[in-house]
Swiss-Prot record:
Listed pathway(s): Porphyrin-containing compound metabolism; protoheme degradation
InterPro entries: BilS (IPR054633), Flavodoxin/NO_synth (IPR008254), Flavoprotein-like_sf (IPR029039)
Pfam families reported in the protein's UniProt record: Flavodoxin_3
Protein name (Swiss-Prot/TrEMBL): Flavodoxin-like domain-containing protein BilS
Entry GO MF terms: FMN binding; oxidoreductase activity, acting on NAD(P)H
Family annotation (NCBIfam families): flavodox_BilS
Amino acid sequence: MKYAIVYSSRTGNTRQLAEKAFEVLGEREGGECVYFGEVPAGPLEGATAQRFREAEILYAGFWTDKGNADSGILSLFKELGKTDNMPPEIILFGTAGFGADQAYYDRIIQAAACELPESVKLKASFMCQGKMQQGVLERYRSMLEANPQDGRAKLMVDNYHAALTHPDGTDMAAFQHFLISSVPAAGMGE
């Protein structure tokens, strides 16, 4: 089975997951990666468009922005939907600064899935916590300075620090297990 792995990563979290997917899927018998890399800039043309057209399944990784996939990956979905370049199945994976809440992860996946062309089947999804940029911590600290009794801001600062090690070894092991269980080895799903 031919597959493509595309990702968008601001802090490197989602890139780590994409690299793990490339490694794990590359070890699977019967699969061929036709594209691996960041979301292409601009319209899909030429060889890049052909690679997406060849893929039977797309692994699409994103970072979370305001409760949805980031604009880069959403733009790719729109671009693929305008043409016949979209693989028939997709597996979404991503990272979010706020972790340990499966219901939150489910809402993010649901929001991202709503952006997919109707012809595409969401086969599976995976989310884990990821570290955030320093500017996020500074924003939360400003909130606390303005109101030292702000429990929500305190919670956000604590969460920022908890996220610094993610994706960690446990996250990566869970992602590897997810990948292996999502696509059978023999023929990679045929």
